[in-house]
């Protein structure tokens, strides 16, 4: 299952992107920003050489969370809810990619905006697709 998100920033920049893929399983998209054309884009992470869908550049950066994720059986322990580990309420979207055997995580708020270069980009889920 996939989700469509609206990326929006206080500078006025808005762009729709996707996370996940449809029933066919032939693609799995995740939000990235392009440093060449300064835009938000959905990139198919299953492709060997992912590129910006706007300009074709390979100079793209993922919004994937780089955090210390914990197994479900220990994540509820008080010690592990402290800093350096993400909490479930900090997660905007989690989506499992079967082809890569990996969960892609997008955290809530304060992402890098490719237009104003501030960490003020937010994502809002607009709809689900399959």
Give each language-model segment a name.
Residues 60-63, 74-76, 87-91:
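Terminal leader/tail segments of proteins
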Residues 14-17, 39-42, 59-61, 103-105, ...:
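Short functional micro-motifs and their immediate structural scaffolds
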Residues 21-29, 46-47, 67-68, 80-81, ...:
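Short linker/helix segments within small regulatory modules
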Residues 26, 30-50, 57-67:
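Structured domain cores in non-transmembrane regions
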Residues 112-130:
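Glycine-rich, aromatic-bearing surface loops/beta-hairpins
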Residues 3-8, 28-31, 49-52, 110:
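Residues immediately within or flanking Cys/His clusters that coordinate Zn2+
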Residues 8-11, 34-37, 52-55, 97-98, ...:
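Short cysteine-rich clusters marking metal-coordination/redox-active sites
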Residues 1-19:
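Short, extreme N-terminal segment that most often corresponds to the first beta-strand
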